[in-house]
Amino acid sequence: MDYATAIGGVAMFTLIIMGLVAIILAARSRLVSSGDVTIHINDNPENDVVTPAGGKLLQTLASEGIFLSSACGGGGTCAQCRCRVIEGGGSILPTEEGYFTQGEIRNHMRLACQVAVKQDMKIEIDPEFFDVQKWECEVISNDNVATFIKELVLKIPDGEEVNFRAGGYVQLEAPPHEVHYKDFDIAEEYQDDWNNFGIFKYVSKVDEPVIRAYSMANYPDEKGLIKFNIRIASPPPRGPDGIPPGKMSSWTFSLKPGDKVTVSGPYGEFFAKKTEAEMIFVGGGAGMAPMRSHIFDQLKRLNSDRKISFWYGARSIREMFYVEDYDQLEEEFANFEWHVALSDPLPEDNWDGYTGFIHNVLLEEYLKDHPNPEDCEYYMCGPPMMNAAVIDMLHSMGVEDENIMLDDFGG
């Protein structure tokens, strides 16, 4: 090969490479958005947002101080960040289709966490999201109230207020972290169970921020704080190896007084109906949180004269909490009563109250002799199996879904 031929070959190769680079850059300019776009919200120019293109709609709105509900933190699994994307959102993705009916899809319903912001958009969101705020709160206390449940109490910043309705929830944000269960502050009376189940051995390591939703246990007149009942989500004791512990619950169990926690909210759908119907609350485990919020709100803030009862299921006396609170309410308000059923009472409990699963106790001890159970309103929050059993029982008694209110978070 002579020198001229070699030079020509190099030149041709260089031209080919430059041509490919030009094609890639041209394609990238068409596929990757850049510059600013305008998001028109709720057909109100005052709500317009001008923002850089390129992110997802959920995070883009959050960067502008508009916090849509997202218990999974934008992972596409909770389906809470529902909104209507009228223009500019492209076609619905397969990851979204399972969360909507065909009618909702035709009405342009989308999950904000799955919608890419590439061009000017026209969307509709719940007006309540404009009232959602974010605070850096401080841990007041984080004490065991049951074997695997802690009551986390946060102080909101001075001068701030969480304008929520009973039954509402907020989102907690955990930073990347590594926590060791052996470092948890667990009350002495519960440590034997933690040792027996081998829970202290776990480590939770999280490399990115985590967001989860938790129902509030306080009611609106308990101001200046936010209260939660959080159950540790440790791997099942007889499950396969390698199951990681819950990211958020592990972090919250590690919190100590003085620690900072980022909170956004309030959100909610699990609200009391404004009727005069009898209210029957059914709870179990950490599902206590919205039950407490609702019941205290009805009796102490609203001075409701509606007939109200609370039916709570626990394993043993050790798993009962807020007992003095409810006993005091029962003494103070003639229209309120509460009942506990223990599914597995310990010999030392010397328990002479109801035993068994709470849905069976509610049926046998109250509803089967109730003149009109279908006219009552039922509010429930607890473990999934409890929720399903209660709903099946209510359906068998002719209770319509419109009178069954379920909070899926607290259990």
Curated annotation (Swiss-Prot):
Residues 132-273 form the FAD-binding FR-type domain. GO terms for biological process: sodium ion transport. It comes from the Bacteria. Its EC number is 7.2.1.1. Keywords: 2Fe-2S, Cell inner membrane, Cell membrane, FAD, Flavoprotein, Ion transport, Iron, Iron-sulfur, Membrane, Metal-binding, NAD, Sodium, Sodium transport, Translocase, Transmembrane, Transmembrane helix, Transport, Ubiquinone. PROSITE patterns: 2FE2S_FER_2, FAD_FR. The keyword Signal does not apply. Coiled coil: none annotated. The chain crosses the membrane at residues 6-26. It catalyses: a ubiquinone + n Na(+)(in) + NADH + H(+) = a ubiquinol + n Na(+)(out) + NAD(+). It is a single-pass membrane protein. The keyword Calcium does not apply. Binds 1 [2Fe-2S] cluster. One of its GO terms (cellular component) is plasma membrane. Its cofactor is [2Fe-2S] cluster; FAD. It is found in: Cell inner membrane. [2Fe-2S] cluster binds at residues 72, 78, 81, 113. Belongs to the NqrF family. PANTHER family: NA(+)-TRANSLOCATING NADH-QUINONE REDUCTASE SUBUNIT (PTHR43644), NAD(P)H-FLAVIN REDUCTASE (PTHR43644:SF1). Composed of six subunits; NqrA, NqrB, NqrC, NqrD, NqrE and NqrF. This is Na(+)-translocating NADH-quinone reductase subunit F. It comes from Psychrobacter cryohalolentis (strain ATCC BAA-1226 / DSM 17306 / VKM B-2378 / K5).
